[in-house]
């Protein structure tokens, strides 16, 4: 029996009565027989209604679709549902009351709301005393309680589900509204508000929460409120828009914090560090970097260097005071293009600074709703009857503030306002988080190459067609891409908090709070699951050469990938404990338990895609179960599958020029590696018997794109795991060793995407590089340090083949002591241990223990954890081979490494004939008495592959005492000085030889056991120095023919040739050597032509002098190639 409207109106509070009146008016206008829950919810969605439900929807969106499409679909779904209700004739509808009565379902919801309010702990005594009146109006239903009860109506829940919403999420957003004041400071435990129960939501609205930002209420600026909310969550705002500068000035005038303006030209490192150190004792510090345009100048080299110095210094200060949490950074830009250029130049600041983009589309924001509680825009507008006096408008008008950018974050839907200090999730919650992230990526619809509504149901596609021109809207795509990052972060925080609240006894996965956005990719994890390929999501486009999320999945994917690292989270305590009611698919968990989840990994997400799982985009109603305090979610299917292409085997690079692996439309600056410069202060590649522990210098910014990741290590910015992108970046740095680079990337992706075989809490990766080409190994290590940990300074290098360390800083220390000392300074780094097979037994035993335990321990008992680090073990011997020497090559890496820089001299010998090489050869390599007589010739017309041979006499000559001594010195014989010496034992040559062999055999077994425990073993091919020598001879021939004619011949001493090859090998490409040939060698030939008349018919000899070149500090090849060649006529 329907209830008269007057009777229902008596049960409602004054704030809820206008909502009922608006619903009755809507039913009367549509000629419906009764006023239902659909009418009431539809009236609350109209712009004139109180913003309670609209704000909850903005925070509780499932984020499966773009904001415009989903909200337009919700408006359409309610319109269609209301049109389906039966209408009555005009004669029957004209009655005395002329008001459609309240339906039974709506009245039942009102009764349930009364019961919930009656059980409210805050008002229990009041209603208990009022219960003696025995009147139905003893409990006046508030609007929030009424909406919560209506959301339990199956009809209403089905309509929300058709638009992609879940009733449980909407309830949670209503129960946990946004705080009335921005909490800019982290509240101590004693002052946090009381917990929020299902029926005590009024406490959250009226709680007196102390805040240091109280004076911001008088600023009257909406932009100040938005900036304050970002700071309260521990993020760093970056203002973009025409009014960004004025908004920053307004906030600086009203902020209680100390604000330091950083000038790139006059930045003072000491002042900034002192101010940041005092931030913990004050209200806080905000570092203002000003306009981003001054950090990204066009062509001014000095201004660019100043910008790099500012970014490096601000990054250092933020990292040093990350635990204190009272230091922020803020900047602004008038155009979005400048912001993109800033991210392109400094791609890692988005992660390191934890930036949040804040669009400012007007110089001054519009004032908040009228009412004393809404002054300054810091309080939500009051619910009044006048709010319903305006005519109804489209639902979208209220959901797209600030020129179409939806700035409300999903974060308010979480259990607490901020994440815990360290993001922890169990495997179950992590899997469900990855499902939601994959749903966002696969259905976000922001790519320009495919239709943005391809994965949506027909109802949502119809809603999206209402946009301008009934097609693709680039403005909408830009806005959706801007808000995608904040969605991922808020989802991550939500699941972290769920897991901490509900799964306290489960084993958790430790996530680093300082890693970027997640990237996921499927890789073969084990043989049993590798046969099931996974479906990848559509890629998200690249804009303005800034590395944006790009979905790439592997052909063979297996178990659920673990994220790599989580973004920075704040230390604010949990404020509320709420009751979570969330719909789930009834068969979803059964499918996850019965069979292995198939992973779909994108750059920003990782989600499992069982084939029989229902898609959340389905418009049909689904059977749901309401589960108390158990977060559930449904799995989703990828919208389309893309297979990542492996790097094809290509011809070995001799010119050291990077090859194009697979075009991703990405432009990365080249990483400059100068082995003999101060940036490699401790890696002197020219010395094989002496090395030091070092850290590579850095300019303060990365040469690579932003490496986003996240959750067990990371991918809370995403699994690090974009295989294709990682291969391309490493290959651009190395320029050769295609197979080794591919194997390294595959090992890293596998370790990041699957659970470590050493346990779920282990995130360290152990790799072993076999073979020669030490320069390629070191360049890869430098690139990994920058890609994985943000800076080349995070590389630790140690050569374990040290018989004596001359450096005073190493005196009295063992190799393990140096490793522990450096790892204690750089907990997240790449540890490169060279010549592992020549290390002493103590170091090898310590490494074996470190692989098992995940920590190093020095001789004094100091322990350092290696979690999140990459340990690279290097040896010259190729895996599976008994020796690592290059066979059949004229120039070996050992000789090139031993080369020192000598002065060069040109000798003129008239009429001397060249007896070696091809008959027409004009440039040859001549022998020298103490080296093998290697003769290589190059015809001036064409290049032919030289087949060099070595005679038996030359082989015997090579076996010199010095070489035998060197081989004996580098043998891996454990010699422990801590063992006692038995002086009475007679020396026996046979016994000593036998013990020598036994010790060597034990050492080899220990090394083999150590190398079998690593995550990946990679073989490096020997560098083809002979081919490089051919190219160098061709360059000499061209210059010789150009300056002295075709009749002149040149002999290059083998020592001089090794010196030139060493310079070319250690440089990034042939550019520096080519410049030396064109400027130094060619100039010497011109001088020789002036001094010697018959030089064109003579034979020239380029030989090295005995005196070495002076040591040159800084970049360049001055230690190998002289700036001037001596002429001896």
Swiss-Prot record:
Keyword GTP-binding tagged: no
Low complexity bias: start-end ranges: 557-568
Region (Repeat 2): 102-180
Sequence similarity: Belongs to the ClpA/ClpB family.
A matching Pfam family: Clp_N
Motif residue range(s): EAR 3: 975-980
Domain Clp R: 8-180
InterPro entries: Clp_N_dom_sf, Clp_R_dom, P-loop_NTPase, SL_signaling_regulator
Biased composition (Polar residues): 596-608
Domain comment in the entry: Contains 3 EAR motifs associated with active repression of several target genes.
PTM comment text: Polyubiquitinated. Strigolactone, but not karrikin, triggers rapid SCF(D3)-dependent degradation via the proteasome.
Biased segments, Acidic residues type: 981-992
Protein name, per record: Protein DWARF 53-LIKE
Record field: compositional bias (Basic and acidic residues): 645-654
Function comment: Repressor of strigolactones (SL) signaling. Subjected to a negative feedback control of SL signaling.
Classification via Gene3D superfamilies: Clp, N-terminal domain, P-loop containing nucleotide triphosphate hydrolases
Motif (EAR 1): 577-581
């Amino acid at each position: 029996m329907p209830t008269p409207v007057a009777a229902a109106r008596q049960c409602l509070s004054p704030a809820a009565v206008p909502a009922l009146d608006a619903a009755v008016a809507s039913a009367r206008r549509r000629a419906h027989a009764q006023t239902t829950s659909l009418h009431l919810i539809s009236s609350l969605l109209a712009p004139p209604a109180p913003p309670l439900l609209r704000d909850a929807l903005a925070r509780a969106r499932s984020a499966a679709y773009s904001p415009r499409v989903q909200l337009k679909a919700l408006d359409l779904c309610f319109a269609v549902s209301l049109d389906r209700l039966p209408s009555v004739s005009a004669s029957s509808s004209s009655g005395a009351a002329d008001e459609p009565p309240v339906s039974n379902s709506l009245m039942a919801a009102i009764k349930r709301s009364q019961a919930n309010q009656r059980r409210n702990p805050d008002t229990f005594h009041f209603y208990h005393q009022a219960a003696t009146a025995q009147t139905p109006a003893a409990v006046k239903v508030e609007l929030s309680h009424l909406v919560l009860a209506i959301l339990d109506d199956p009809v209403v829940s089905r309509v929300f589900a058709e638009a992609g919403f879940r009733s449980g999420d909407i309830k949670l957003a209503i129960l946990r509204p946004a705080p009335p004041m921005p909490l800019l400071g982290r509240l101590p435990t004693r002052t946090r508000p009381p917990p929020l129960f299902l029926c005590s939501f009024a406490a959250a609205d009226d709680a007196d929460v102390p805040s240091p930002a109280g004076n911001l209420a008088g600023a009257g600026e909406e932009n100040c409120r938005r900036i304050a909310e970002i700071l309260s969550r521990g993020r760093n705002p970056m203002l973009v828009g025409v009014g960004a500068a004025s908004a920053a000035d307004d906030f600086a005038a009203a902020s209680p914090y100390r604000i330091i303006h950083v000038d790139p030209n006059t930045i003072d490192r000491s002042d900034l560090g002192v101010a940041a150190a005092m931030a913990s004792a004050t209200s806080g510090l905000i570092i203002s970097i000003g306009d981003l345009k001054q950090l990204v100048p066009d062509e001014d080299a000095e201004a660019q260097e100043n910008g790099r110095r500012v970014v490096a210094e601000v990054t250092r200060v933020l990292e040093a005071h990350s635990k204190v949490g009272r230091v922020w950074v803020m900047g602004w830009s008038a155009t979005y293009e400048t912001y993109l250029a800033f991210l392109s130049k400094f791609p890692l600041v988005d992660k390191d600074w934890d930036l949040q983009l804040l669009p400012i589309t007007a110089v001054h924001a519009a004032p908040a709703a009228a009412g004393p509680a809404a002054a300054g825009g810091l309080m939500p507008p009051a619910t009044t009857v006048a709010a319903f006096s305006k005519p109804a408008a489209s639902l979208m008008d209220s959901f797209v503030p600030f020129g179409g950018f939806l700035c409300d974050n999903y974060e308010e839907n979480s259990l607490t306002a901020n994440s815990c200090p360290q993001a922890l999730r169990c495997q179950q919650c992590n899997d469900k988080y990855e499902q939601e992230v994959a749903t966002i990526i696969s259905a976000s619809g922001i790519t320009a190459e495919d239709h943005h509504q391809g994965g949506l149901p027909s109802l949502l596609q119809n809603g999206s067609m209402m946009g301008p021109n009934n097609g693709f809207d680039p403005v909408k795509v830009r806005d959706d891409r801007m808000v995608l990052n904040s969605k991922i972060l808020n989802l991550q925080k939500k699941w972290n908090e769920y897991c901490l609240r509900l799964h306290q006894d489960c084993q958790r996965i430790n996530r680093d709070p300082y890693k970027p956005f997640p990237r996921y990719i499927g890789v073969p994890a084990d043989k049993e699951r590798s046969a099931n390929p996974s479906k990848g999501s559509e890629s998200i486009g690249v804009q303005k050469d800034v590395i944006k999320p790009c979905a790439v999945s592997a052909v063979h994917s297996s178990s659920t990938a673990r994220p790599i690292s989580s973004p920075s989270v704040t230390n604010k305590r949990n404020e509320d404990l709420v009751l979570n009611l969330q719909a789930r698919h009834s068969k979803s968990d059964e499918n996850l338990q019965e069979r292995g989840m198939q992973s779909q990994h994108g750059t920003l997400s990782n989600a499992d895609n069982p084939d029989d799982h229902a898609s959340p985009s389905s418009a049909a109603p689904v059977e749901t179960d309401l589960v108390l305090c158990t977060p559930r979610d449904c799995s989703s299917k990828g919208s389309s599958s893309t297979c990542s292409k492996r790097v094809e085997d290509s011809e070995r690079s001799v010119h050291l020029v990077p090859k194009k692996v697979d075009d991703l439309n990405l432009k990365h600056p080249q990483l400059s590696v100068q082995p003999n410069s101060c940036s490699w202060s401790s890696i002197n590649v020219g010395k094989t018997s002496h090395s030091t522990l070092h850290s590579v210098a850095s300019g303060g910014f990365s040469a690579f794109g932003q490496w986003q990741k996240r959750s067990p290590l990371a991918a809370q910015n995403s699994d690090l795991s974009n295989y294709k992108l990682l291969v391309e970046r490493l290959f651009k740095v190395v320029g050769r060793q295609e197979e080794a680079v591919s194997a390294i990337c595959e090992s890293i992706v596998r370790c990041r995407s699957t659970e470590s075989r050493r346990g779920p809490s282990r995130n360290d990766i152990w790799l072993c590089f076999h073979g020669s080409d030490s320069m390629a190994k070191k360049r890869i290590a430098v690139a990994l340090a920058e890609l994985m940990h943000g800076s080349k300074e995070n590389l630790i290098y140690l050569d374990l083949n040290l018989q004596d360390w001359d450096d005073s800083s190493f005196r009295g220390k063992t190799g393990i002591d140096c490793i522990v000392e450096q790892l204690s300074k750089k907990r997240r780094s790449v540890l490169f241990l060279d010549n592992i097979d020549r290390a002493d037994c103590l170091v090898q035993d310590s490494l074996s223990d470190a692989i098992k335990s995940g920590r190093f321990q020095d001789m004094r008992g100091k322990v350092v954890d290696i979690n999140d680090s990459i340990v690279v073990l290097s040896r010259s011997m190729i895996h599976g081979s008994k020796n690592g020497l290059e066979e059949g090559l004229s120039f070996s890496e050992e000789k090139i490494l031993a080369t020192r820089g000598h002065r060069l001299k040109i000798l003129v010998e008239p009429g001397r004939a060249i007896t070696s090489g091809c008959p027409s050869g004009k440039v040859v390599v001549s022998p020298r008495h103490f080296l093998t007589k290697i003769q290589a010739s190059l015809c001036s017309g064409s290049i032919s592959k030289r087949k060099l041979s070595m005679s038996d006499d030359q082989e015997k000559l090579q076996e010199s005492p010095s070489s035998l001594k060197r081989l004996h010195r580098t043998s891996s014989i454990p010699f422990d000085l801590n063992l006692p010496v038995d002086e009475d034992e007679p020396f026996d040559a046979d016994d000593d030889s036998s013990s020598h062999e036994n010790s060597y055999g034990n050492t080899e077994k220990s090394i083999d056991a150590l190398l079998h425990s690593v995550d990946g073993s990679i073989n490096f091919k020997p560098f083809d120095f002979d081919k490089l020598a051919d190219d160098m001879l061709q360059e000499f021939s061209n210059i010789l023919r150009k300056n002295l004619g075709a009749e002149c011949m040149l002999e290059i001493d083998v020592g001089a040739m090794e010196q030139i090859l060493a310079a070319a090998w250690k440089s990034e490409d042939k550019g520096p050597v080519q410049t030396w040939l064109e400027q130094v060698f060619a100039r010497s030939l011109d001088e020789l032509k002036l001094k010697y008349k018959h030089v064109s018919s003579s034979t020239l000899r380029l030989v090295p002098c005995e005196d070495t070149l002076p040591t040159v500090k800084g970049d360049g090849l001055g230690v190998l190639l002289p700036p001037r060649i001596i002429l001896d006529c």
